[in-house]
């Protein structure tokens, strides 16, 4: 399980480092797949950034604030050096805090913020006794925090378009 968490953290760190502005407008809905997922566990998904545009082939994503309770957390993350906001209002991930440990810490802080501020999850998914994965679809495109009822999972991911493989 620790190896999977490390690999996931490295993957998310890579996505965060290459995230930057591009000129394709994000349209449609997306999905997040949690694999492996623990049986009989509730996963809460929180949208923390809007996805304005993306280029799937280059793995480039342009994010903006959501205009809700997450904006204060995003401002705090900018102050702490995890994120940057450029002059056009696009949120990018800092290259100075892009290590797997930094990504995990950012995710932990985001989940603590959601709990402390009683933020309602954008979506929830409960796995069955025999489920080893969970897919949450129909999500607005954006950057999401995923937390579990057991605290076993704490990660960040982009809701990819439904056609994304």
Question: What feature does the model see in each segment?
Answer:
Residues 1-165:
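Solvent-exposed loop/turn and edge beta-strand elements of beta-rich ligand-binding domains
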